[in-house]
C-alpha cells in the first residue's frame, strides 16, 4: 500500500446539530466506523461533494438534513487504496468493503476493517484514502485527528463564519 502526502480539498455532510464541531471525530468514535473502532476518533471525508452526500444519506433517496462543508487537507502520511484491493497487499485488505455495520451491530462480529485500522495505526499514518461503497467512482478519506502530525493541516473552509459556534444554534 502506498503511503504518501496529500494536499487536497475534501467534503463532509455535517449533521446540523453537531455542525459547530466540523473537525470532531467524536461521532465516529461513539459507535465505530468502517476504519475505526469504538473509542477511536475518526473524521470521514469525501473527495467529491456528491460522494459526501451519498455517504451521509447512505445512498437512500429520503434522508435527514445536512450541511455540506469543504475542508482543506494537507497530511504527510496517508495510505492510499483508491482503486481497492491490490493482490500484493496483506490478504486481510481483501475485506475492506465488508458490510461492517451488519457484522458488528447485527452479528456481533468484529469487522476485519478494524484490524486494518490497527495496521494503519502501527504504520503511523494519519489517514486512508479508499473507494466509496455508496457511490461508485467516489473516493473517501478517513483521518485520525489524534494521529496527525503537528505539521499536518486540517481546516474547514468557512471564511464568512457561517457555521455555528455552539450547539445553542439548534435549540
Model features per residue range: what roles?
Residues 33-63:
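Extended catalytic/binding region for NAD+/ADP-ribose chemistry, centered on the ART fold
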Amino acid at each position: 500500500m502506498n503511503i504518501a502526502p496529500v494536499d487536497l480539498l475534501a467534503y463532509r455532510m455535517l449533521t446540523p446539530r453537531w455542525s459547530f464541531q466540523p473537525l470532531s471525530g467524536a461521532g465516529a468514535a461513539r459507535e465505530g466506523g468502517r476504519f475505526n473502532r469504538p473509542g477511536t476518533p475518526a473524521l470521514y471525508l469525501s473527495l467529491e461533494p456528491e460522494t459526501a452526500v451519498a455517504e451521509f444519506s447512505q445512498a437512500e433517496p429520503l434522508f435527514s438534513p445536512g450541511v455540506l462543508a469543504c475542508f482543506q487537507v494537507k497530511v504527510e502520511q496517508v495510505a492510499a487504496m483508491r482503486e481497492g484491493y491490490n493482490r500484493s497487499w496483506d490478504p486481510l485488505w481483501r475485506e475492506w468493503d465488508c458490510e461492517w455495520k451488519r457484522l458488528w451491530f447485527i452479528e456481533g462480529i468484529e469487522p476485519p476493517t478494524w484490524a486494518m485500522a490497527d495496521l494503519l495505526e502501527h504504520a503511523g499514518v494519519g489517514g486512508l484514502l479508499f473507494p466509496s461503497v455508496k457511490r461508485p467512482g467516489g473516493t473517501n478519506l478517513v483521518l485520525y485527528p489524534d494521529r496527525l502530525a503537528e505539521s499536518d493541516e486540517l481546516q474547514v473552509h468557512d471564511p464568512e463564519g457561517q457555521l455555528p459556534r455552539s450547539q445553542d444554534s439548534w435549540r
